[in-house]
Amino acid sequence: MKKFIYLMAMVCTLGFFTACSSDDDDNDKDNFVRNEKIEGTWKVQEAGMDPTTYLPTGSVVLKWEGSDDAAITIPGFNEDKPYPIKDAISTAPLILNGMLRSVLQDVTFNEKGQISATYKEEADDNDWKVANDYATYQVVNEKMITLFLNKTKITEDIDDAQEKAMITSMLDQFKTGIPVHVSYPAANKVYFYVDKDFIAPIIATLYTQVNKIPTTGMDQEDLAQFQMLKAIVNQLPTIMEKTTKFEAGLELIK
C-alpha cells in the first residue's frame, strides 16, 4: 500500500509525469523526430531561497491563478484552519525542492526518445542508481513532447495483488501519454510542465479512486498517511473549480 500512497501523493503535490503507455513501444525509432534542445543530461537544481525576494529556488515550479477565497485545510497544519491556495503554492516549492533534490540527481533525454534518471530510493541512501526503461518521449514540436511511462516496469516489483491492480488502473487512464509543455528560460535551462487541462482529469480520477480504497489491513502508519491524503484529495475538485490557471513542472539545468 505504501507505493500506492506515494504515487498518489506525488500526483497531488507535483501533478506531473504520472501516466503511461501501453506495454508495446509505439515509437518508430527509424523516424523519430528529434528536438536537440532538450537532448542530454539535465540536472536538478539545488534547493534554496532567493536572498532578495525570499522566494524558494530550485527545480520544482508551481504556478497558480484563481479565486482569492480558494483554500485548503491540511490535517495538522496551520491549526487545521483553511490555508489560502495562493500561499500554499508559493511556499510548497520550499519543501518540495529539498525533497526532490535528495532523491533525484538528473534526467537524461537521448536522441532516440528514451529517458533515464539518476535517483535514490531513499534520501538517506548512500548510493545513486540509474533508472532505465521507465519512460520514453515523442516530440510534438519545439514546445511540446508527449511523455510515456512503462506500466509493466513501474508495477513489476509490486507483490500485493490489490495494490498492483489499483496502480495499474490509475496508469491505464493515460495510455495516450502526457502532453508536456516545454520552454527555455535560459540557454542552460529547460522547463517541463503540465497545465490545468491535464491536471483536472487526474484530480477527478484521484477523487474517485481514493474514496474506493478500503483501509482494512493498513498498519497505523499507512492509515495515518492515507487519511491525510484522502482529506487533501477530497478538497481538490472544489479548488480546481476556483482555479483559472495552473502549471506544475520541473526546471532543469545543464
Predicted regions and their residues:
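Bacterial N-terminal signal peptides that target proteins for export
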Residues: M1-M8
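Short, flexible helical or helix-coil boundary motifs
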Residues: M8, C12, A92, L96, ...
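Post-signal-peptide N-terminal segment of Sec-exported extracytoplasmic proteins
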Residues: T41-E79, M99, V103
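Contiguous, well-ordered beta-strand patches that form the walls/edges
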Residues: G48, N78-T205
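Flexible coil/linker segments and helix-coil junctions enriched in charged and small residues
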Residues: W64-Y83, D159-S169, T208-Q235
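Edge beta-strand at a domain terminus
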Residues: Y134-V139, A200-K254
